[in-house]
Regions:
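Walker A (P-loop) phosphate-binding motif
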Residues: 1-54
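Conserved beta-strand/loop subsegment of P-loop NTPase cores
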Residues: 110-113, 138-148, 157-185, 205-210, ...
Length: 278
């Protein structure tokens, strides 16, 4: 490729490790460095530029969410998507899902894993929880980001790869959640993590509904959730990723808790990003 490629992915099957927040954080950091960054993620067909006004059921919830932070493309062929982004003026391309085993050679490979879940037995499915064996996957990356509490980070200290400990934190929006009666619903990799975040913010979670990752927000489902929230006298609340799947008429009635990646130290990542342009 004629421009630097940053591949971001996870060895863990099933999602929920924090790849999307990492992609957003890297895109924001590159933008702060005055670089025109585009994001490419897997989708159907030829490369398509995503507008924030697109519908999630047509383009996917994660591409639609990322498009709020950087120009975003979907493509069945990630290499074609990267070329389309470069042709459109990208100075650097982040490939969401570019690890492991991508056909696109990356200038910087970033693995993202849950510090709590770890790598299990380190073996690939069906013998273990990973897409490919741990050591093979680590060999494809330049840096490993482990997301989770500090008490869970020590298990990764002996790995032969530069590592950045990080956590997901709610974005400070000025909303005071203390004592707020909420009905929470989430269709993400680990919905329980969202419910725990609300508890940590001081909200009173009087009802909750865990949905499947990327689950369709059908009228019947939303009617049921709204009815349950009303019966409990609670405010409906969900994640950023789920919010983009809501119909426009419902969005004003549902509060959203954005979360952002917070590394313990940005320095090593900033250095690696800067090297892409030297």
């Amino acid at each position: 490729m004629s421009r630097p490629i940053v591949a971001v992915g996870s060895l863990t099957r099933g999602g929920g490790t924090g790849v999307t927040p990492t992609v957003i954080a890297l895109a924001q950091k590159l933008s702060e460095m005055q670089r025109n960054v585009h994001v490419v993620t897997t989708g159907a067909g030829t490369p398509r530029s995503i507008a924030y006004t697109d519908r999630a059921e047509e383009v996917g919830d994660e591409p639609l969410l990322i498009a709020a932070f950087a120009p975003t493309w979907t493509a069945a062929d990630l290499a074609m998507g990267a070329r389309a982004a470069i042709d459109a003026g990208a100075e650097v391309v982040i490939i969401d899902g570019g690890l492991p085993d991508s056909a696109v050679r990356a200038d910087l490979g970033v693995l993202v894993e849950s510090a709590v879940r770890g790598f299990g037995n380190g073996r690939a499915w069906p013998l273990g929880p990973l897409k490919i064996a741990r050591d093979k996957g680590l060999s494809q990356a330049d840096v490993l980001i482990t997301l989770g509490p500090m008490r869970a980070q020590t298990d990764f200290e002996s790995l032969p790869i530069p590592r950045v400990a990080a956590r997901l934190e709610p974005l400070q929006t000025g909303m005071d959640w203390t004592g707020a009666r909420v009905f929470a619903f989430a269709g993400i990799g680990v919905p329980e993590r969202f419910f725990a975040t609300l508890n940590d913010l001081g909200a009173e979670v009087v009802g909750k509904q865990a949905l499947a990752d990327h689950q369709d927000m059908t009228p019947a489902l939303l009617t049921r959730l709204a009815r349950e929230a009303a019966m409990l006298g609670a405010q409906m609340v969900t994640t950023e990723k789920d919010a983009v799947r809501l119909p426009p008429e419902l969005r004003p009635h549902v509060l959203v808790v954005p979360v952002r990646l917070v590394p313990e130290d940005w320095t090593s990542l900033e250095v690696r990003l800067a090297r892409l342009f030297t």
